Amino acid sequence: MVVIGIDFSIQFPAACICRDFKEFQWIACVNANTTKAYRKFLEDVQAENSSLNFIFLEPRERQAKGQETYSGTERLKLANYSHLVDQFVSGIKSLVKNDDQIIVSIEGIAYGAQGNALIDISQATGMVRKAMLDKVLIGEKERLFIFSPGELKNAIGAKGNAGKFDVYQTFMKDPKIAENSSLHTCINMNTENIIKGQEVKSPFMDMIDSYLAVLKIHESLKEFD
Protein backbone atom coordinates (compact mmCIF):
# COMPACT_ATOMS: atom_id res chain seq x y z
CA MET A 1 0.00 0.00 0.00
CA VAL A 2 1.16 3.51 -0.79
CA VAL A 3 -0.01 6.50 1.20
CA ILE A 4 0.51 9.94 -0.31
CA GLY A 5 0.38 12.79 2.17
CA ILE A 6 -0.05 16.27 0.74
CA ASP A 7 0.56 19.69 2.23
CA PHE A 8 -0.56 22.05 -0.51
CA SER A 9 0.27 25.71 -0.75
CA ILE A 10 0.72 28.11 -3.63
CA GLN A 11 4.34 28.79 -2.69
CA PHE A 12 5.84 25.44 -1.62
CA PRO A 13 3.50 22.44 -2.08
CA ALA A 14 4.96 19.20 -0.77
CA ALA A 15 4.09 15.51 -0.75
CA CYS A 16 5.28 12.51 1.22
CA ILE A 17 5.03 9.16 -0.55
CA CYS A 18 5.15 6.26 1.90
CA ARG A 19 5.20 2.58 0.98
CA ASP A 20 3.86 0.19 3.64
CA PHE A 21 4.75 2.74 6.34
CA LYS A 22 8.41 1.76 5.95
CA GLU A 23 9.86 3.55 2.93
CA PHE A 24 9.57 7.30 2.48
CA GLN A 25 10.08 9.68 -0.41
CA TRP A 26 9.35 13.38 -0.51
CA ILE A 27 8.77 15.80 -3.34
CA ALA A 28 8.32 19.55 -3.08
CA CYS A 29 8.00 22.50 -5.41
CA VAL A 30 10.47 25.32 -4.84
CA ASN A 31 9.40 28.92 -5.42
CA ALA A 32 11.24 30.80 -8.16
CA ASN A 33 12.04 33.62 -5.70
CA THR A 34 14.42 31.35 -3.78
CA THR A 35 17.92 32.81 -3.55
CA LYS A 36 20.70 31.31 -5.66
CA ALA A 37 22.59 30.21 -2.55
CA TYR A 38 19.58 28.43 -1.07
CA ARG A 39 18.70 26.84 -4.40
CA LYS A 40 22.28 25.52 -4.60
CA PHE A 41 21.85 24.06 -1.11
CA LEU A 42 18.62 22.33 -2.18
CA GLU A 43 20.28 21.00 -5.32
CA ASP A 44 23.07 19.54 -3.18
CA VAL A 45 20.52 17.97 -0.82
CA GLN A 46 18.73 16.38 -3.77
CA ALA A 47 22.00 15.06 -5.23
CA GLU A 48 22.89 13.42 -1.91
CA ASN A 49 19.41 12.05 -1.12
CA SER A 50 17.56 10.18 -3.85
CA SER A 51 14.39 10.17 -1.74
CA LEU A 52 14.27 13.98 -1.39
CA ASN A 53 13.06 15.49 -4.66
CA PHE A 54 12.62 19.14 -5.60
CA ILE A 55 10.81 20.72 -8.54
CA PHE A 56 12.35 24.13 -9.20
CA LEU A 57 9.59 26.35 -10.52
CA GLU A 58 9.96 28.97 -13.21
CA PRO A 59 8.86 32.56 -12.46
CA ARG A 60 5.11 33.01 -12.75
CA GLU A 61 3.63 34.93 -15.61
CA ARG A 62 2.53 38.44 -14.61
CA GLN A 63 0.63 41.29 -16.21
CA ALA A 64 2.59 44.28 -17.42
CA LYS A 65 2.86 46.90 -14.69
CA GLY A 66 0.26 49.61 -15.10
CA GLN A 67 -1.85 47.47 -17.43
CA GLU A 68 -3.46 45.20 -14.84
CA THR A 69 -7.13 44.30 -15.28
CA TYR A 70 -9.42 42.18 -13.12
CA SER A 71 -9.96 39.64 -15.89
CA GLY A 72 -6.28 39.53 -16.69
CA THR A 73 -5.40 38.90 -13.06
CA GLU A 74 -7.89 36.06 -12.74
CA ARG A 75 -6.79 34.48 -16.03
CA LEU A 76 -3.16 34.51 -14.93
CA LYS A 77 -4.01 33.04 -11.55
CA LEU A 78 -5.85 30.20 -13.27
CA ALA A 79 -2.98 29.60 -15.69
CA ASN A 80 -0.31 29.77 -12.99
CA TYR A 81 -2.19 27.50 -10.58
CA SER A 82 -2.94 25.01 -13.36
CA HIS A 83 0.74 24.87 -14.27
CA LEU A 84 1.75 24.46 -10.63
CA VAL A 85 -0.75 21.65 -10.03
CA ASP A 86 0.27 19.88 -13.25
CA GLN A 87 3.94 19.91 -12.28
CA PHE A 88 3.25 18.87 -8.71
CA VAL A 89 0.91 15.99 -9.55
CA SER A 90 3.16 14.80 -12.39
CA GLY A 91 6.05 14.71 -9.93
CA ILE A 92 4.01 12.63 -7.51
CA LYS A 93 2.92 10.24 -10.27
CA SER A 94 6.55 9.68 -11.25
CA LEU A 95 7.20 8.21 -7.79
CA VAL A 96 4.34 5.67 -7.72
CA LYS A 97 3.63 2.60 -9.81
CA ASN A 98 0.50 2.02 -11.84
CA ASP A 99 -0.36 -1.09 -9.83
CA ASP A 100 0.08 0.53 -6.41
CA GLN A 101 -2.89 0.52 -4.04
CA ILE A 102 -2.92 4.21 -3.22
CA ILE A 103 -4.48 6.27 -0.45
CA VAL A 104 -4.26 10.06 -0.62
CA SER A 105 -4.33 12.09 2.57
CA ILE A 106 -4.56 15.88 2.26
CA GLU A 107 -4.41 18.64 4.81
CA GLY A 108 -7.57 20.72 4.74
CA ILE A 109 -7.54 24.46 4.25
CA ALA A 110 -6.34 26.50 7.21
CA TYR A 111 -8.61 29.50 7.57
CA GLY A 112 -5.95 31.76 9.04
CA ALA A 113 -5.64 33.37 5.62
CA GLN A 114 -8.04 36.19 4.85
CA GLY A 115 -9.49 37.99 1.86
CA ASN A 116 -7.98 37.25 -1.55
CA ALA A 117 -5.31 34.98 -0.05
CA LEU A 118 -7.99 32.63 1.28
CA ILE A 119 -9.83 32.70 -2.05
CA ASP A 120 -6.63 31.94 -3.95
CA ILE A 121 -5.53 29.01 -1.79
CA SER A 122 -9.07 27.60 -1.81
CA GLN A 123 -9.18 27.72 -5.60
CA ALA A 124 -5.74 26.14 -6.01
CA THR A 125 -6.45 23.48 -3.37
CA GLY A 126 -9.63 22.47 -5.18
CA MET A 127 -7.60 22.06 -8.35
CA VAL A 128 -5.00 19.80 -6.74
CA ARG A 129 -7.70 17.68 -5.08
CA LYS A 130 -9.42 17.13 -8.41
CA ALA A 131 -6.13 16.36 -10.14
CA MET A 132 -5.21 13.77 -7.51
CA LEU A 133 -8.68 12.22 -7.70
CA ASP A 134 -8.67 12.06 -11.50
CA LYS A 135 -5.02 11.28 -12.29
CA VAL A 136 -3.76 9.31 -9.29
CA LEU A 137 -6.83 7.69 -7.74
CA ILE A 138 -8.56 7.30 -11.13
CA GLY A 139 -11.86 8.45 -9.69
CA GLU A 140 -11.85 6.25 -6.57
CA LYS A 141 -12.98 8.97 -4.17
CA GLU A 142 -13.15 6.54 -1.23
CA ARG A 143 -9.34 6.52 -1.23
CA LEU A 144 -9.15 10.29 -0.67
CA PHE A 145 -9.05 11.59 2.91
CA ILE A 146 -9.01 15.22 4.03
CA PHE A 147 -8.04 16.11 7.59
CA SER A 148 -8.08 19.38 9.48
CA PRO A 149 -4.68 20.93 10.31
CA GLY A 150 -5.37 20.28 14.00
CA GLU A 151 -5.96 16.56 13.43
CA LEU A 152 -2.63 16.24 11.65
CA LYS A 153 -0.74 18.01 14.42
CA ASN A 154 -2.39 15.73 16.97
CA ALA A 155 -1.16 12.68 15.04
CA ILE A 156 2.44 13.45 15.92
CA GLY A 157 1.63 14.48 19.47
CA ALA A 158 1.45 18.25 19.07
CA LYS A 159 -1.45 20.42 20.17
CA GLY A 160 -4.06 21.21 17.55
CA ASN A 161 -3.19 24.92 17.73
CA ALA A 162 0.58 24.36 17.77
CA GLY A 163 2.68 26.67 15.65
CA LYS A 164 5.03 25.55 12.89
CA PHE A 165 8.13 25.61 15.08
CA ASP A 166 6.43 23.53 17.77
CA VAL A 167 5.46 20.93 15.18
CA TYR A 168 9.03 20.93 13.87
CA GLN A 169 10.42 20.38 17.37
CA THR A 170 7.98 17.54 17.99
CA PHE A 171 8.95 15.90 14.68
CA MET A 172 12.66 16.18 15.41
CA LYS A 173 12.29 14.81 18.94
CA ASP A 174 10.03 11.90 18.02
CA PRO A 175 9.27 11.45 14.30
CA LYS A 176 7.33 8.23 14.99
CA ILE A 177 7.53 5.98 11.91
CA ALA A 178 9.85 8.42 10.09
CA GLU A 179 12.78 7.87 12.44
CA ASN A 180 16.01 7.59 10.41
CA SER A 181 14.15 8.75 7.30
CA SER A 182 16.03 10.88 4.78
CA LEU A 183 14.08 14.00 5.78
CA HIS A 184 14.73 13.63 9.51
CA THR A 185 18.41 12.88 8.91
CA CYS A 186 18.82 15.73 6.42
CA ILE A 187 17.37 18.32 8.78
CA ASN A 188 19.54 17.02 11.63
CA MET A 189 22.65 17.38 9.49
CA ASN A 190 21.81 20.79 7.99
CA THR A 191 20.19 22.71 10.82
CA GLU A 192 22.25 25.83 10.12
CA ASN A 193 20.83 26.04 6.58
CA ILE A 194 17.25 25.13 7.45
CA ILE A 195 16.51 26.78 10.80
CA LYS A 196 16.61 30.55 11.26
CA GLY A 197 15.62 31.51 14.79
CA GLN A 198 12.20 29.91 15.18
CA GLU A 199 11.55 29.72 11.45
CA VAL A 200 11.84 26.44 9.56
CA LYS A 201 12.66 27.28 5.97
CA SER A 202 10.50 26.00 3.17
CA PRO A 203 10.18 23.51 1.68
CA PHE A 204 11.34 21.52 4.73
CA MET A 205 8.45 22.57 6.97
CA ASP A 206 6.06 21.78 4.15
CA MET A 207 7.66 18.34 3.78
CA ILE A 208 7.22 17.70 7.50
CA ASP A 209 3.56 18.74 7.21
CA SER A 210 3.06 16.36 4.28
CA TYR A 211 4.44 13.54 6.43
CA LEU A 212 1.83 14.31 9.11
CA ALA A 213 -0.87 13.46 6.56
CA VAL A 214 0.72 10.02 6.12
CA LEU A 215 1.12 9.56 9.87
CA LYS A 216 -2.57 10.36 10.39
CA ILE A 217 -3.54 7.45 8.13
CA HIS A 218 -1.13 5.18 10.01
CA GLU A 219 -2.58 6.20 13.38
CA SER A 220 -6.15 5.80 12.09
CA LEU A 221 -5.46 2.28 10.82
CA LYS A 222 -3.92 1.30 14.17
CA GLU A 223 -7.25 2.05 15.83
CA PHE A 224 -8.84 -0.76 13.81
CA ASP A 225 -6.18 -3.36 14.65
Please tell me what each predicted stretch does.
Residues M1-D225:
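Phosphate- and other anionic-substrate recognition elements at nucleic-acid/protein interfaces
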